[in-house]
Amino acid sequence: MQFTGKEDIEAPIERVFEEITDFQGFERSALRRGADVRRTDKLKVPGVGMSWHAAFKLRGKQRKVDVTVAEYDPPNGIKLGLMSPSIEGQMVAELVALSRGRTRMTVTLVLQPRTLAARLMMQSLRLARNNLTKRF
């Protein structure tokens, strides 16, 4: 299942890339919301191979996910791989400079079920696709 969203941002492409790759900020945000986030790589600078393990409660059930940076192309975009026991996927954020101070960001999320329960959940998502696409 695939979700895509586009947004034009009034900021230079370099600034937008800095914001979408503020990994420490995302870690702090997840921790404030009650998730347990651990960095699982030893890289000193941002790039391909960065990875995290996160555990959090969603809809009353404990969930776990591993996230890995699969592509890192400053300032054009980033690709993340997502792996959990029931779902795998990838998220791609592409940036295009429309002018010196304006950037178009396209985010694509592709999810694939790995278990029967995940297939049933994906079927529910397909039925609610229009509402989810509006929110995405």
Where are these regions (language model features)?
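Hydrophobic ligand-binding cavity/cleft-lining segments
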Residues: 1-47
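Short, surface-exposed coil-to-beta transition loops
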Residues: 2-4, 62-66, 87-92
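Beta-strand elements of well-folded, non-transmembrane domains
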Residues: 9-11, 56-60, 71-73, 95, ...
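Short amphipathic alpha-helical segments
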Residues: 12-18, 128, 132-135
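A short, structured loop/turn motif at beta-sheet edges
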Residues: 13, 45, 71-75, 94-104
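Hydrophobic pocket/interface hotspot
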Residues: 16-20, 26, 52, 69, ...
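Glycine-rich portal/gate segments that line the openings of hydrophobic small-molecule binding cavities
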Residues: 38-84
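Beta-strand/loop substructures that line and gate deep hydrophobic ligand-binding cavities in soluble
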Residues: 79-134
